[in-house]
Every structure is written in C-alpha cells, then in structure tokens.
C-alpha cells in the first residue's frame, strides 16, 4: 500500500531533481568567446574554470572562504615519489638500490625498507633510513617544485595572451561625438556671457535650462573651445 505522500508525489508535475538532471546544468555551450569555449572543462564549475584559465569570476574582493585544492592519494604519492627520486639523484642513489640494501645509511631519513617473509608476507624487519639530506639539496627540491608550478601556470598564461590578442583584434574604434550646431550656439552664448566662470554659468535659468552641473558645463565648453581653436 503506497502512502498518501507518495501518491501526491507521483501526481505532481514537479519532478525530482536527480544527479542525472543536475549534471546537465554544467553541460553548457560557451558562445561569448571562442578561446574560452576551446579551453572550457565541463567537469568543473564556473569558478574552477576561471581559476584554471587565470581569470577571475568576480572583480570584487573575496568575501568568505576560499576553496582549497584537495589532492588525491595518487597525486600525493606521485609528488612524494618525484621528490624522493630527485633527492636520490642528488645523492647518487637509485630506488632499486634502496629496495635491495639493508644499510640504513643508504636510505634517506623519513623513508624505510620493509622486509617481508616471501611465503607468509609477514613483516620481518623494518630498516629506517639515516641518510641526511643537505640543505642545498632541499633548496634544489624547492626550486624544482617552483619550476613545476611555473610550468603548470604557463597554460593559463597562454590563454590570457590569446584573450588579449583576440580583444585587441576585435576591439571597436570609439568614434568621437561632435557637437551639433544648436549645441555649439548654446555653448558660445554661455562662454560670451560668463567666460570661464562655470559656477555662475550653472545658475543661469534662461541659458542653462536643464540645470547642468558646473563640471558638465566645463566639459562641454572645453570641447567647444577645442573645436573652434579658442585658448
């Protein structure tokens, strides 16, 4: 026997918002810019896409928390292995040598070799490394990490460069607005009566019918003087 609530839900015109329907919201087509459309990742959100492309989704200051980058276990292991390989390369030691050696002085500090029983796979012995890593080596590792981050940022920089070139190529030339004959006569009448005294000019009820401010009148008179070569 179905409950009353379930029967009402079945008759309702509002369908349940399932994950299958929700994911369709991300499947959008970018029509505004071909470069952004080409580099858009539909599996990411708008904010994540903008950050990956080196752009900002909002021009204002950040209010609230910032989404932290969560690394997967595979990424952490790969990063740790790459760091270890670089350290071993600087110490002239290979990973294969560490996997075979029982000398703690040939294993870096923070690493260990686990020796297991080949039949039962039980841990028989754990050899902890005692090989110290020099400060210069740590600096080299940090430099290598910075170089990796720079390489990752080059993709975003190339997109920004493409966008700048596209904007410069498709920028519209702004046409300067010219004053009409009637507007020129009006500016001339104001200038002949008040000169450069824009504060008195704005209180003239007959000439300044629309009560334009002193700053607006100054811009218009300056433009009229420039068009008529008046200093």
Curated annotation (Swiss-Prot):
Annotated organism of origin: Lodderomyces elongisporus (strain ATCC 11503 / CBS 2605 / JCM 1781 / NBRC 1676 / NRRL YB-4239)
Pfam families in the record: Nop16 (PF09420)
GO BP term, example: ribosomal large subunit biogenesis
Keyword hit for rRNA processing: yes
Biased composition regions of type Basic residues, renumbered to the chain: 1-23
Entry's family note: Belongs to the NOP16 family.
Function: Involved in the biogenesis of the 60S ribosomal subunit.
PANTHER family the record matches: HSPC111 PROTEIN-RELATED, NUCLEOLAR PROTEIN 16
Complexes and interactors: Component of the pre-66S ribosomal particle.
InterPro entries: Ribosome_biogenesis_Nop16
Ranges of Acidic residues composition bias in the record: 136-150
Record keywords: Nucleus, Ribonucleoprotein, Ribosome biogenesis, rRNA processing
Protein name: Nucleolar protein 16
Annotated compartments: Nucleus, Nucleolus
Region (Disordered): 1-28, 135-156
GO annotations of cellular component type: nucleolus; preribosome, large subunit precursor
